[in-house]
Each structure stands twice: as C-alpha cells, then as structure tokens.
C-alpha cells in the first residue's frame, strides 16, 4: 500500500493536496495501482482499494441487454415527465473507458483509461429493440461512449502491464505503440444503419479527431462519417488554439485540428454536401492568460468561426485541471500555474 498525505495535511496545505492528487492519479489503474491509505487524525484511516478490472465484452453485453424500460420512472408523470430523456432514449452505449487523457475530464477516474467494448451483435440487437419502441421515428441518436471512435484498448502493452504512468496515449502526440484502427467501429455503424426501420444513425458522443487523423486509413471513416452520420453540423473539441494552454489541457496542437478541418471540407466537396463544424472552446482554463485569450479571439476571427456559446472553465471533482485550479501548481512538477479566478480576470 501507499500512504497519502493525511486529511489534516491536505486540508492545511495546497502543496500536500497536489501531492495527494498526483499519487492517486498514478494509481488509478487495476493492474499496477496500489492500495491508498489516508490517515484521519489518530483514530482511523480511509483505505481506497485499486479499481477492479474493467468489464469484459461478455459482461458488458449481459448488462446492457437486461430488460430495461428505457424511460423515466412513472412517478415523474405528474410533473410532465423528464424532458432530458429525449436526448438519450434512442442512443446506444458501445464502449466504456477513455485513453484521451484531457486534463479537465474526470472520465479516467469514472471508467479508467482502458477501453472495453460491447460486441457488434449485442449493439445490433439493442438497435433492433429500439426500432420497436414507441416513439421511434427511424433515428438513432448515438452509437458511442466517452469517446465514440475508441473501441479497443490503446495497445497490447496496456493489456499486459496496465496503462503507462510516465506518459499519455495521445498527448503530446499519439504513442507509436498505439493500435489505431476504425474498421471495427465502421462495421458497427454499417450494421446498425442497415437495419430495417433505421433511417439515420448519428454520432453525438464525440469523435476524437487527433486519433482519427493518426489513422492511415482515416479517409474511409471520414467519408462515411460525412455521408451517413452528420445531420448538418459536426461538433468537435479543439478546446483552444494557444500551445501553452493546449499543453495544460493535454490536447493536441491546433495544427491537428486544422488538418482535420481541411480533410472534412475536402470530403464535403467530394460528396457535394455542405456540412459545418462547431468547435468547442474553453476560456480561463488553468494556465490560460490574457494573451492566450487574445490569441484565441484572433484565431476565431481568422478562421471565420462565430461561436454562439463559450464554456468558461469551472472546477469539477477528480480532474487534473481542478487540482491546478485550487492549488495553482502542477501536481507532478510543482511548477506554479496561473489561474484566472476573479470575474475581472475572466472577462
């Protein structure tokens, strides 16, 4: 086991808080992760066991094929139902886990970095059930997960020895050991959209564009994406354009997004369609300064993007970015990190 700084220490010291986060971050893994112990005064300790092994394909199939009702509880009828159900009632979960490694995202803690997926047959069976559900009009809103185009563990090393502690899979660039392949996901999408009663299959859970562009055969996926799975706009998440901020976010250089955008437009011309990209951006992320905000504004002006909304960073439990927001330091190096906290700084 490994001792964390005590509750009293992390409560009194931001440096101890950052140290505790770094230890937890490196041990959030089922093969190599150690049992973590945090002392709470002189009476007791809190013990956190390593995560369990991610569910297998067979286990995921069994769980997702249980006879769920697929709607809200009748107790909500008196209040008019739950409007948000419309966003997910005709969506299909195909995978769990994410090796994307974004600093502002807690999915690594919820589901782990090792991706596990349902079988194609299980997904098709669920899609068939959706076509028989009341209210189905021929549109499946999503076939995806934390990241839609992740269908397998990043590499063989990950399966044998666990995820790497010294580097991320995609940041600062895709690891050379990574198995990059969209053929399985393409097969799933083809099978679902070929079902009787299915008019269109959308992808709403997000395409990781740097992973797609690293695939030597990305043209095939891009063409089918534009031809069959985009309603008119595709939402992707470059998050910023300034290299310093992207580094803090653990996101790829903006040149990767630009290459993706050009490929997307090229595919549109080939198919004689007019589809748009809606890029997501985050303002005042830890490490983002006024000059970085100006750089982003100029980028938007030069590219012609007119965002109708911008997400201002807000701290959420369990993320690297939130640790930096609170401690104002990098938990792995101890280096100071600028954080815009006041309304004046954010504006």
Where would I find each of the regions flagged by the language model?
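N-terminal pre-triad scaffold of radical SAM enzymes
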Residues: 77-106, 124, 139, 314
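Radical SAM enzyme [4Fe-4S]-AdoMet core and its adjacent flexible, acidic
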Residues: 53-55, 63, 154-183, 247-249, ...
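Conserved, mostly hydrophobic/aromatic
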Residues: 63, 98, 123, 236, ...
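Iron-sulfur (Fe-S) cluster-binding segments and ferredoxin-like electron-carrier domains
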Residues: 105-122
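Catalytic cores of alpha/beta
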Residues: 220, 285-302
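Conserved SAM/AdoMet-binding glycine-rich loop
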Residues: 129-278, 282-286
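Short helix/loop capping segments that flank catalytic or ligand/cofactor-binding pockets
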Residues: 46-50, 56-58, 71-74, 101-104, ...
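Flexible, acidic/Gly-rich N-terminal and inter-domain linker regions that tether
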Residues: 1-88
């Amino acid at each position: 086991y490994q001792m964390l700084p005590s509750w009293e220490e992390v409560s009194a010291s931001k440096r101890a808080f950052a140290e505790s986060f770094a230890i937890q971050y490196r041990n959030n893994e089922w093969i190599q992760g150690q049992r973590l112990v945090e002392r709470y005064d002189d009476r007791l300790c809190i013990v956190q066991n390593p995560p369990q092994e991610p569910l297998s394909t067979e286990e995921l199939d069994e769980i997702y094929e249980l006879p769920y009702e697929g709607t809200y509880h009748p107790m909500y009828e008196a209040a008019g139902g739950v409007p948000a159900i419309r966003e997910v009632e005709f969506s299909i979960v195909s995978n769990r886990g994410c090796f994307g490694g974004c600093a502002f995202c807690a999915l690594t803690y919820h589901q782990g970095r090792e991706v596990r997926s349902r079988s194609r047959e299980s997904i098709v069976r669920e899609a068939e059930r959706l076509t028989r559900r009341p209210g189905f009009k021929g549109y499946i809103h999503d076939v995806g997960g934390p990241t839609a185009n992740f269908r397998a563990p990043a590499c063989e090393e990950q399966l044998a020895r666990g995820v790497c502690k010294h580097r991320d899979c995609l940041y600062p660039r895709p690891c050379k050991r990574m198995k990059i392949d969209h053929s399985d996901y393409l097969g799933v999408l083809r099978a679902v959209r070929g079902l009787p009663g299915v008019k269109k299959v959308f992808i709403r859970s997000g395409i990781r564009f740097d992973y797609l562009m690293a695939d030597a055969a990305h043209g095939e996926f891009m063409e089918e994406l534009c031809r069959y799975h985009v309603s008119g706009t595709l939402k992707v998440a470059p998050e910023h354009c300034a290299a310093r901020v992207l580094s803090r976010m653990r996101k790829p250089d903006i040149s990767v997004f630009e290459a993706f955008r050009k490929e997307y437009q090229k595919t549109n011309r080939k198919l004689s369609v007019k589809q748009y990209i809606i890029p997501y951006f985050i303002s005042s992320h830890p490490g983002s300064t006024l000059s970085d905000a100006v750089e982003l504004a100029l980028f938007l002006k030069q590219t012609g993007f007119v965002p109708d909304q911008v997400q201002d960073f807000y701290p959420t439990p369990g993320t690297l970015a939130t640790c930096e927001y609170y401690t104002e330091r990098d938990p792995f190096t101890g280096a100071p990190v600028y954080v815009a906290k006041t309304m004046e700084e954010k504006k």
